[in-house]
């Protein structure tokens, strides 16, 4: 069925309360979008962060009398008469099919493919990780995930142990296992990430070789031949002492979730314990790798 979209602009501080007003006016869903198309980086646990200049978008049934909606909004103290807004009719589409059509198998390095379950595998002889895109966790589309997957593909992981620190969907740990790692350990602060990793590991037939822990429950004295942490620059700096002890001597470290402009600050936190490689960049993001001294 077709829909009607109402868009209005506000500040990040007022966006959520304005979204509630749109729901009260009959919107069946409300979304927030940056007016200037800037990214919002991952918030701290329990924190909701929006842009300073935010578009609030309400979706209404096509039968809705939008004149009545506008009149109601004009009477609301947070909005008032003459508020600037845009109303448009949305084309009726099979949104689920259109969404699925946007995702295709992706190749990382020489051997590794990430494939949605509804697509044919391009190369049955390659290393294929079956992973469907979701809302919260990595699927290879983000440059930082791509950088980490390319790095894992370049390593000899046969018989090795890997720690995925901040595992999210489990994509990096699962890819490592399918690339030959004997064992992988996924750690995350989010219980939903642990469940997503568990489900994805089962779908890929590697669940028996993947151990998963909430960060607060991770065993003491963990170590691995390879450690990858695709999180954010701030946590990578703050947790440098914890992460640095995880690789064995001569082991590999891979860090991402870092903007190219943040690379020097993150590298500085690890350079005492690692021989660092040149920074790899993709778009505005980068990857820092090295060998444990």
From Swiss-Prot:
Q: Which reaction does it catalyse?
A: L-lysyl-[protein] + 3 S-adenosyl-L-methionine = N(6),N(6),N(6)-trimethyl-L-lysyl-[protein] + 3 S-adenosyl-L-homocysteine + 3 H(+)
Q: Keywords for this entry?
A: Cytoplasm, Methyltransferase, S-adenosyl-L-methionine, Transferase
Q: What class of enzyme is it?
A: transferase
- Which top-rank group of organisms is this from? Bacteria
InterPro entries xref list: Ribosomal_L11_MeTrfase_PrmA, Ribosomal_PrmA_MeTrfase, SAM-dependent_MTases_sf
Q: Where are its TM segments located?
A: none
Q: Which SUPFAM superfamilies does the record associate with it?
A: S-adenosyl-L-methionine-dependent methyltransferases (SSF53335)
Q: Which GO terms describe its molecular function?
A: protein-lysine N-methyltransferase activity
- The principal localisation class reads cytoplasm
EC numbers: 2.1.1.-
What does UniProt give as GO cellular component? cytosol
A UniProt-annotated Pfam family: PrmA
Q: Keyword Coiled coil, does the record have it? A: no
Question: Which residues, if any, are the signal sequence?
Answer: none
**Gene Ontology terms: biological process:** methylation
Give the location in the cell: Cytoplasm
- What residues does S-adenosyl-L-methionine bind to? 145, 166, 188, 230
Function according to Swiss-Prot or TrEMBL:
Methylates ribosomal protein L11.
UniProt similarity note = Belongs to the methyltransferase superfamily. PrmA family.
- The identity of this protein, by name, is Ribosomal protein L11 methyltransferase
- Recorded source organism is Yersinia pseudotuberculosis serotype IB (strain PB1/+)
């Amino acid at each position: 069925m077709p829909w009607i979209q109402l868009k209005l602009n506000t500040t990040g501080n007022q966006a959520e309360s304005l979204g509630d007003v749109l729901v009260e006016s009959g919107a069946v869903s409300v979304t927030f979008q940056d007016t200037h198309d800037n990214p919002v980086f991952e918030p701290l646990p329990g924190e909701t962060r929006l842009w300073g200049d935010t578009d609030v978008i309400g979706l209404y049934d096509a039968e809705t009398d939008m004149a009545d909606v506008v009149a109601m909004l004009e009477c609301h103290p947070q909005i008032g008469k003459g508020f600037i807004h845009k109303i448009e009719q949305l084309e009726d589409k099979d949104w689920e099919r259109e969404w699925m059509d946007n995702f295709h198998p992706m190749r990382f390095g020489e051997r590794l493919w990430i494939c949605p379950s509804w697509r044919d595998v391009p190369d049955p002889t390659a290393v294929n990780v079956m992973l469907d895109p979701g809302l919260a966790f990595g699927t290879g589309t983000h440059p930082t995930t791509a950088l980490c997957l390319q790095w894992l593909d370049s390593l000899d992981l046969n018989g090795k142990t890997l720690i995925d620190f901040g595992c999210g969907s489990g994509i990096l740990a699962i890819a490592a296992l399918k690339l030959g790692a004997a064992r992988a350990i996924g750690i995350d602060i989010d219980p939903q990430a642990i469940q997503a990793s568990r489900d994805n590991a089962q779908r890929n037939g590697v669940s028996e070789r993947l151990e998963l822990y909430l960060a607060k429950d991770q065993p003491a004295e963990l170590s691995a031949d390879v450690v990858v942490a695709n999180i954010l620059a701030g946590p990578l700096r703050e947790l440098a002492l914890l992460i640095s002890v995880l690789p064995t001597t001569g082991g590999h470290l891979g860090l991402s979730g870092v903007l190219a402009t943040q690379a020097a600050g993150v590298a500085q936190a690890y350079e005492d314990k690692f021989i660092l490689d040149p920074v790899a960049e993709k778009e505005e993001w980068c990857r820092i790798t090295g060998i444990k001294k």
